[in-house]
Curated annotation (Swiss-Prot):
Pathway: Cofactor biosynthesis; ubiquinone biosynthesis. Removes the pyruvyl group from chorismate, with concomitant aromatization of the ring, to provide 4-hydroxybenzoate (4HB) for the ubiquinone pathway. HAMAP family: UbiC. One of its GO terms (cellular component) is cytosol. This is Chorismate pyruvate-lyase. It is an enzyme of class 4 (lyase). It comes from Klebsiella pneumoniae subsp. pneumoniae (strain ATCC 700721 / MGH 78578). Pfam families: Chor_lyase. The gene is ubiC. Its EC number is 4.1.3.40. Belongs to the UbiC family. The keyword Cytoplasm applies. GO terms for biological process: pyruvate biosynthetic process; ubiquinone biosynthetic process.
């Protein structure tokens, strides 16, 4: 199954050099904390529409492969994050199979729970970088995060109804 927003997410082109962004845009794109929590601070009820979830091979990765360890299998989760039922963000998480051991096995059992609710309660979470991307008028970002030093890649596309615009 796919979703048009996830097609746009996969089409993001990332800036080699961080662009100069006006404060409202940079406040959203460079946020270090949970996007779920930020949406809830807007007074919205946040829900997840799960689009894809399961293992994929390395050949299914795009330029993501260069940002993750070389492994035969990766856990993929693609979602739409809704605020009061309106789609605000498309998200794609890719985690190498080796990341999914110990407490990080919970990444496979999130179901309708936003990823941020899990990630940002972990004291072992670190972020290596945030890359800013764009597809036509839509902005997005990609981060390599680590849980207990184990990597995962999170890509987010801000949809037209989100407060970023």
């Amino acid at each position: 199954m796919s979703h048009p927003a996830l097609t746009r997410l996969r089409a993001l082109r990332y800036f080699a050099v961080m662009p100069s962004l006006p404060p409202p845009l940079s406040d959203w794109l460079l946020l270090e904390d949970s996007m779920t929590q930020r949406f809830e601070q807007q007074g919205k009820q946040v829900t997840v529409t799960l689009v894809n979830e399961g293992y994929i091979g390395r050949d299914a990765l795009t330029d993501e492969a260069a940002l993750l360890p070389d492994e035969p299998r990766y856990w993929l989760r693609e979602i739409i994050l809704n605020a009061d039922g309106e789609p605000w963000l498309a998200g794609r998480t890719v985690a190498p199979e080796s990341t999914l051991c110990g407490p990080e096995l919970a990444l496979q059992q999130l179901g309708q729970t936003p990823l941020g609710r899990y990630l940002f309660t972990s004291s072992t979470l670190t972020r290596d970088f945030i890359e800013i991307g764009r597809d036509a008028a839509l902005w997005g970002r990609r981060s390599r995060l680590r849980l207990s030093g184990k990597p995962l890649l999170l890509t987010e596309l801000f949809l037209p109804a989100s407060p970023l615009y």
